[in-house]
Amino acid sequence: MARVKRGNIARKRRNKILNLAKGFRGGNKNLFRTANQRVMKALCNAYRDRRRRKRDFRRLWIARINASARINGTNYSKLINGLKTSEIIINRKMLAQLALNDPQSFEKIVSAVSK
């Protein structure tokens, strides 16, 4: 059986982790053990927060729609119910964009729904 020396493979593996740890503070970017722990934690956080981002943006859109709807004399739940009953198909992201960037169009939608 031939002798296997893992020098190149081990260095590659460590450098891969240390490259992922660039930008971390202190020994977390230089020392392999701590860098490995920090990278694993960072990847866990990234996985979790990719799912959380969807929730956070939906909450932001709803808050923006509600604020603009209240300015126009209704509230969020009545506006969404009116959109459903009048069969206007527009999602919350588009509604929030309209409320923020084009208040006149948003006002027309609210008036069309509240009739």
Swiss-Prot record:
<protein>
    <recommendedName>
        <fullName>Large ribosomal subunit protein bL20</fullName>
    </recommendedName>
</protein>
<keyword id="KW-0699">rRNA-binding</keyword>
<keyword id="KW-0687">Ribonucleoprotein</keyword>
<keyword id="KW-0689">Ribosomal protein</keyword>
<dbReference type="InterPro" id="IPR049946">
    <property type="entry name" value="RIBOSOMAL_L20_CS"/>
</dbReference>
<dbReference type="Pfam" id="PF00453">
    <property type="entry name" value="Ribosomal_L20"/>
</dbReference>
<dbReference type="GO" id="GO:0005840">
    <property type="term" value="C:ribosome"/>
</dbReference>
<keyword id="KW-0694">RNA-binding</keyword>
<dbReference type="InterPro" id="IPR035566">
    <property type="entry name" value="Ribosomal_protein_bL20_C"/>
</dbReference>
<comment type="function">
    <text>Binds directly to 23S ribosomal RNA and is necessary for the in vitro assembly process of the 50S ribosomal subunit. It is not involved in the protein synthesizing functions of that subunit.</text>
</comment>
<dbReference type="GO" id="GO:0000027">
    <property type="term" value="P:ribosomal large subunit assembly"/>
</dbReference>
<dbReference type="InterPro" id="IPR005813">
    <property type="entry name" value="Ribosomal_bL20"/>
</dbReference>
<comment type="similarity">
    <text>Belongs to the bacterial ribosomal protein bL20 family.</text>
</comment>
<dbReference type="GO" id="GO:0019843">
    <property type="term" value="F:rRNA binding"/>
</dbReference>
<dbReference type="GO" id="GO:0003735">
    <property type="term" value="F:structural constituent of ribosome"/>
</dbReference>
<dbReference type="GO" id="GO:1990904">
    <property type="term" value="C:ribonucleoprotein complex"/>
</dbReference>
<dbReference type="GO" id="GO:0006412">
    <property type="term" value="P:translation"/>
</dbReference>
